[in-house]
């Protein structure tokens, strides 16, 4: 269908333009490598060799012309290629250095799944003062959290996926001489499209936390599943006929998983709504306070919510208006609730110290300040409170 092909061509141009204006260097690199890999693979197929060559030439010329006429693109790229000693240090590279130090202390099993954010304060670089949340390199975060053993197991799975895709490739690619029943098959497009898409996600994951975004993670898993399913065309061994028992068992298993996930997902949904309401309210308003308190009741395991409640009460108490002592005492209780969930969080210790200091209990405050400094020695905010 010629019309549909023209539509797809224009859609690709719009997508390319959208990626260009994101000003994401990682996005540009991932797009460039994936398109080059796609065209190189087509160059090896005699039926599409001419079209792939023309497309490659057009993209190279078009990319050069766009880059040559865009000062914004030049400036963005020069930030990477021409960084000198006077330029600001890349925060991302400092996070990577801290992550490598983290891995060196936990080489084999890592710090634990999802524990990077908690462990980062022990390895913080003095020029990185905020919580990064993620490493901004999925593979490095995988190594730090799961260690060599976990990284090796997951790497083995990825290697098997790549090997399966390569094995499937020669069975699904249609030659020009194929005039049989598979002439209009989309198997080759499916294998090639999923493979190139996963390549793009992998390249971008070197510079960001792609797979920690649920939508991206689900997309990657779906693409991998579709790619694996194409193995059935390589040999009859991969065909499996399901009977009634297997279908009933699989359905029951899915329903059981959905049942056990419904309660935590419902709580997460309620918490997200309350936190959104709190973020939209004025910083020290009663609306924000009530929303945060309700969110803490819905999901007590979130250490950040009680900390935020305590911070609001502390700021109100430090106005030193009548009744401020009670506000500071309640703030201390909320900070302690935060520590019940994450006992090594440095900020609640520092805030408890501030509350006690404001109450004139300086001797009681000192151990809390020292504990905060011990947990997060390179945090200038913690140091300032000392």
Functional labels for PLM-detected ranges:
Residues 1, 36-46, 67, 162-170, ...:
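Structural signal for the C-terminal ends of transmembrane alpha-helices
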Residues 1-2, 13-31, 38-105, 113, ...:
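A membrane-periplasm/extracellular boundary helix in multi-pass inner-membrane enzymes
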Residues 5, 175-188, 223-266:
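A juxtamembrane structural motif centered on a specific transmembrane helix
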Residues 6-17, 29-40, 57-60, 149-162, ...:
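Lipid-exposed faces of alpha-helical membrane segments in multi-pass integral membrane proteins
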Residues 16-33, 185-237:
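Membrane-embedded alpha-helical segments of integral membrane proteins
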Residues 78, 91-142, 146-153:
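TM-adjacent membrane-interface loops and short helices in multi-pass inner/ER membrane proteins
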Residues 148-189, 360:
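Hydrophobic transmembrane alpha-helices and their immediate junctions
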Residues 275-386:
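C-terminal luminal/periplasmic domains and tails of membrane-associated envelope-modifying transferases
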